[in-house]
């Protein structure tokens, strides 16, 4: 996979997500990797599991805290 320019042939994961502002939305992403790291936006700055993924709606690479995924819709 080209991480900077994912293609439509990649598997897309859909889920409902609550961001650090408390806003809830459905997201469509192409997962890149899962890591543990500190983030000012997640888990009060303590280390947590993060999915790094290409967000298809925002057209950029984003970090998603796994603990903030509310519901998985599956792979589409």
Show where each model-derived region lies.
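Core beta-strand-centered patch of the WYL/Sm-like small regulatory domain
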Residues: 1-76
């Amino acid at each position: 996979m080209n991480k900077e320019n994912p293609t439509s042939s990649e598997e897309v994961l859909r889920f409902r997500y609550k961001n650090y502002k408390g806003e809830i939305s459905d997201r469509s992403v192409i997962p890149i990797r899962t890591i543990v790291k500190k983030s000012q936006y997640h888990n009060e700055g303590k280390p947590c599991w993060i999915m790094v993924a290409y967000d298809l709606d925002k057209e950029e690479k984003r970090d998603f805290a796994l603990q903030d995924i509310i519901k998985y819709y599956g792979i589409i």
